């Protein structure tokens, strides 16, 4: 099929369409090759566009040039292009020919450079002027048509978004004029621009496309921002005297990491066609802030430079750059009885090395396949795995995905490993004194009162909205932790480098919603205040100017040179929205401070056999707990190291609970434990944080709905309304039965004496952790559904699974009716006194009174159903959970937690807003009172989703091995 000239613009579209259809694994090599062709095509098309536009501006639009000059230049440029077969650098050509706009006089008088053309034009001045003018106008019209076509193609190829307004040719010309001066190498720029611009290191060594790769990257700003940090500028060069704006970090979850093309050490040339070459750091930051939601970056990087792997890149890409970056090797392992024999850490959301989403080897098992092979080392980066003919990329993936990939290996596997000395050093803390994530957390400073150090050293977090452990001030945004947790495990020591000036630097940080995003230590004995940790993605990290190891000399002109820790914390706390820091990079002093912390830790460990107090605080305590709250480490800026996320009901193996503030833990998944270890807040820390948060906002039961009861406690109203509760002080009122959400006739429900007492004190209860132990059972667990929709869920379970779910027969003192059968409809108790004695003896999990008759559910009835292999569905209150546990019948207690009042109304459209509000408040109150007894909490947007989650929880908690409360103290 012949190629038509008018269809040339579709070449790129056809190529990209073909590339998109290559989805099979065997097409990978072809895809990579086509990607190279597309990049080259785009680069050359863009270069041609710049050359034509430059010619148009410097020659045709130059009013200082005569028609003869423009004609001569045009002919020479055309001849040059035809001869060379490629575009010519217009500015360099005009300069070499003395044809630029500042050389008009020399052009007209230089016979040696254009003697032939000049003599031909001067033979008939009038005729030739008319002819030349007509020729130039014709050329201009032709050029304009061609330029518009190229510009329209360019806009189609690199349009920002589908909804973006299509720029006009005139707007595009103006944008390209600014971009071409910033995006092309200095040799391609206008000579006057080169002479007028400030020279910078690195610019002189550029050799066009031989030294640099240029790339246009379009990012869409999401909830996590653009997701990268920058450094550099004319006021703060990043490398030597190079004032370029460098990419220094890619933030996990950000737009840049998701896109996968931007790399660390890339140089930003322009932002949305605004040049950031030779500009102050603040100007580059401002350009990024003003760029809007769709940001187009024009970046360059040196050829042959190893870059941070992009998201989605395969192992082959890593091997392609291995010659100049990390050494990439392949290791064949055969899975044995001990598995592959190594542990991993890292991944998106659980970075092992700050700023790096890679998966790293953290432990080699004795006698395992990896140790026997001998080539795999701690600190190696796992790039990909190949098994059964398929290759799985493990760069920029979650930790869970990496674990699942390794677990799916059945026998033989090939590991693609990146060996980098830097990674190994970082992973181990940068030195022998560094803490690793697996090491023991140490005691608080208050318990380290030795003769050598009586001072208290805190780690200060300037981002967490919680109350200081030493203060009851509600508005405090600072949380101190102990001295030995001040050094984040696994975080590299501050390493001296000449890239960071040792002179004091002025740094401005805009405080974000969660604070400044860095920690400080020090402040005792005149040792200074040092930055010990910078939160990834926080304001300090995004600015890229503050460094770990910086000493803070002043905050908003408040001198901190000899300040105490408390004075520095107060200065930062009251610094306002914009904070100006005077910092000096002093890594040696900071490392000495860190070494002192390590020395204190070692002394504490060596002295463990001494006093009883020291022994109790330094021994490594391990236990299993059930989490009674949801925890997202990304929202806890006080973390000294990598956090471990979990949900309400998750089982955690706390491997080290010796610290008062932070525990080390890993999740228990079924019969196994996750290899990923992380930091979680201790029981004490979490409860303190929650009480501080709720100090000014107390939930008052249904006092909000009934102002007349504001001053009455729940227990007082019980005693006032029902005299029966004085005889049986575990009775529950009719209005509270309705609060539980039952649609049945109201009647009184029994508590036990200790339940009643506990309820009066439960208002201050904060749910944190429950100590648990593993137990094997030989019965089917009862099921208790609490919260809105419980009646519908109960009915659906029995209807859908009649062979798996059932109900027990209740007891009553009511006389038997003619059609009723004892033991089928009710267990009829002969006397009221007998049933009252059984209630007092805790033989009933719940009982109540209706029309002067007692009704109740006995432990024996529930056990009878459980031993028949059915889940006994119980419509009871939260107090029955504890009574079943005492009777060794551990129920699966599922709480359906509504998301909002609106969600309650959505699931029951017959409800009024007032009814929905009361239902929602009752549910929240129920969670506060009984949350510690819930097996799990379920939320959803639809009834079907909630029902599905409830079933999944019941199946997963059915046994035969379950986790039950233990008596171990937390």
UniProtKB/Swiss-Prot annotation:
Matching CDD domains: GMPK (cd00071), PDZ1_Dlg1-2-4-like (cd06723), PDZ2_Dlg1-2-4-like (cd06724), PDZ3_Dlg1-2-4-like (cd06795), SH3_DLG-like (cd11861)
Keywords: Cell adhesion, Cell junction, Cell membrane, Cytoplasm, Cytoskeleton, Developmental protein, Differentiation, Membrane, Neurogenesis, Phosphoprotein, Repeat, SH3 domain, Transducer
GO molecular function: guanylate kinase activity; protein kinase binding
Top-level division of the source organism's lineage: Eukaryota
GO biological process: anterior/posterior axis specification, follicular epithelium; asymmetric protein localization involved in cell fate determination; basal protein localization; behavioral response to ethanol; cell fate commitment involved in pattern specification; cell fate specification; cell-cell adhesion; chemical synaptic transmission
Domain L27: 4-64
Domain Guanylate kinase-like per the UniProt entry, residue ranges: 780-955
Chain spans, region Disordered: 161-209, 424-477
Domain PDZ: 216-303, 330-421, 506-587
Cross-referenced InterPro entries: DLG1-like (IPR016313), GK/Ca_channel_bsu (IPR008145), Guanylate_kin-like_dom (IPR008144), Guanylate_kinase_CS (IPR020590), L27_1 (IPR015143), L27_dom (IPR004172), L27_dom_sf (IPR036892), P-loop_NTPase (IPR027417)
Principal location: cytoplasm
Residue stretches of biased makeup (Low complexity): 171-204, 437-462
Assigned protein family: Belongs to the MAGUK family.
Protein's name in the database: Disks large 1 tumor suppressor protein
Gene: dlg1
């Amino acid at each position: 099929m012949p190629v038509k000239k008018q269809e040339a613009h579709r070449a790129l579209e056809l190529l990209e369409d073909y590339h998109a259809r290559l989805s099979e694994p065997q097409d990978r090599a072809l895809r990579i090759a086509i990607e190279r062709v597309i990049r080259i095509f785009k680069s050359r098309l863009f270069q041609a566009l710049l050359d034509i536009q430059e010619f148009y501006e410097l020659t045709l639009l130059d009013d200082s040039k005569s028609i003869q000059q423009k004609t001569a230049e045009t002919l020479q440029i055309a001849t040059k292009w035809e001869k060379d077969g490629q575009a010519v650098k217009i500015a360099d050509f005009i300069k070499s020919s003395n044809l630029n706009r500042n050389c008009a006089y020399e052009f007209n008088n230089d016979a040696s450079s254009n003697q032939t053309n000049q003599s031909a034009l001067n033979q008939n001045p009038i005729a030739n002027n008319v002819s030349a003018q007509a020729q130039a106008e014709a050329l201009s019209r032709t050029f304009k048509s061609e330029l518009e076509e190229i510009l329209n193609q360019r806009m189609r190829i690199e349009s920002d978004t589908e909804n973006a307004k299509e720029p006009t040719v005139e707007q595009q010309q103006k944008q390209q004029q600014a971009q071409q001066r910033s995006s092309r190498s200095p040799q391609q720029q206008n000579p006057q621009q080169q002479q007028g611009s400030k020279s910078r290191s690195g610019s002189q060594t550029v050799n066009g496309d031989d030294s640099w790769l240029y790339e246009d990257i379009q990012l869409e700003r999401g909830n996590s921002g653009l997701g990268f940090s920058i450094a550099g500028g004319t006021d703060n060069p990043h490398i030597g005297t190079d004032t370029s704006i460098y990419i220094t970090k890619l933030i996990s979850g950000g737009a840049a990491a998701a896109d996968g093309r931007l790399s660390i050490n890339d140089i930003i040339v322009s932002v949305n066609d605004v040049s950031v070459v030779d500009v102050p750091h603040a100007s580059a930051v401002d350009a990024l802030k003003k760029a809007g939601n769709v940001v187009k970056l024009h970046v360059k990087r040196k050829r042959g430079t190893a870059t941070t792997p992009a998201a989605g890149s395969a192992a082959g890409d890593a091997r392609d750059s291995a010659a100049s970056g990390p050494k990439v090797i392949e290791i064949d392992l055969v899975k044995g009885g001990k598995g592959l024999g190594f542990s991993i850490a890292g991944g998106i959301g659980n970075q092992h090395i700050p700023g790096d989403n890679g998966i790293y080897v953290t432990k080699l098992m004795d006698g395992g396949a990896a140790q026997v092979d001998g080539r795999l080392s701690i600190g190696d980066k796992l790039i990909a795995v190949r098994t059964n003919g398929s290759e799985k990329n493990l760069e920029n993936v979650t930790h869970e995905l990496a674990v699942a990939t390794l677990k799916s290996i059945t026998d033989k596997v090939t590991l693609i490993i990146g060996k980098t000395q830097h990674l190994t050093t970082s992973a181990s803390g940068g030195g022998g004194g560094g803490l690793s994530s697996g090491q023991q957390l140490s005691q608080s400073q208050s318990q380290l009162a030795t003769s050598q150090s009586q001072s208290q050293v805190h780690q200060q977090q300037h981002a967490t909205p919680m109350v200081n452990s030493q203060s009851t001030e509600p508005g405090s945004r600072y949380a101190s932790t102990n001295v030995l947790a001040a050094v984040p495990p696994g975080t590299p020591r501050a390493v001296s480098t000449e890239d960071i000036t040792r002179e004091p630097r002025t740094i401005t940080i805009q405080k974000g919603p969660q604070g400044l995003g860095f920690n400080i230590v020090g402040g005792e004995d005149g040792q200074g205040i040092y930055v010990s940790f910078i939160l990834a993605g926080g304001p300090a990290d995004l600015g890229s100017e503050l460094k770990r190891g910086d000493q803070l000399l002043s905050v908003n002109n408040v001198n901190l040179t000899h300040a105490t820790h408390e004075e520095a914390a107060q200065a930062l706390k009251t610094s306002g929205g914009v904070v100006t820091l005077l910092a000096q990079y002093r890594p040696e002093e900071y490392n000495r401070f860190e070494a002192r912390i390590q020395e204190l830790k070692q002394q504490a460990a060596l002295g463990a056999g001494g006093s009883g107090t020291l022994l109790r605080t330094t021994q490594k305590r391990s236990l299993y707990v059930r989490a009674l709250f949801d925890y997202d480490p990304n929202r806890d800026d006080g973390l000294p190291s990598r956090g471990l996320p979990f949900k309400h009901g998750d089982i955690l193996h706390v491997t080290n609970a010796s610290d008062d503030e932070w525990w080390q833990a890993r999740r228990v998944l079924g019969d196994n434990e996750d290899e990923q270890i992380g930091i979680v807040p201790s029981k004490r820390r979490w409860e303190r944080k929650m009480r501080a948060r709720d100090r000014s906002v107390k939930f008052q039961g249904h006092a909000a709905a009934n102002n007349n009861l504001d001053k009455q406690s729940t227990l007082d109203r019980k005693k006032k309304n029902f005299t029966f509760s004085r005889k049986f002080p575990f009775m529950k009122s009719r209005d509270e039965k309705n609060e539980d959400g039952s649609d049945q006739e109201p009647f009184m429900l029994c508590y036990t004496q200790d339940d009643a007492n506990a309820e009066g004190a439960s208002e201050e209860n904060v749910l944190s952790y429950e100590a648990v132990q593993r137990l094997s059972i030989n019965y089917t667990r009862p099921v208790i559904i609490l919260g809105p929709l419980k009646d519908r869920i109960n009915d659906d379970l029995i209807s859908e699974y009649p062979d798996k779910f059932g109900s027990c027969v209740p007891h009553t003192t009511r006389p038997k009716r003619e059609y009723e059968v004892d033991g089928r409809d009710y267990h009829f108790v002969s006397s009221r006194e007998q049933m009252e004695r059984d209630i007092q003896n805790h033989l009933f999990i719940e009982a109540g009174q209706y029309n002067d008759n007692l009704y109740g559910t006995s432990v024996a009835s529930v056990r009878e159903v459980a031993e028949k292999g059915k889940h006994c569905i119980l419509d009871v209150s939260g107090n029955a959970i504890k009574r079943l546990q005492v009777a060794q019948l551990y129920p699966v207690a599922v709480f359906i937690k509504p998301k909002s009042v609106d969600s309650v109304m959505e699931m029951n459209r017959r409800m009024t807003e007032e009814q929905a509000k009361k239902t929602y408040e009752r549910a929240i109150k129920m969670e506060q009172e009984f949350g510690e007894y819930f097996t799990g909490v379920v939320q959803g947007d639809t009834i079907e989703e909630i029902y599905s989650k409830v079933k999944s929880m019941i199946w997963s908690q059915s046994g035969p091995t379950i986790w039950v409360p233990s008596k171990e103290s937390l």
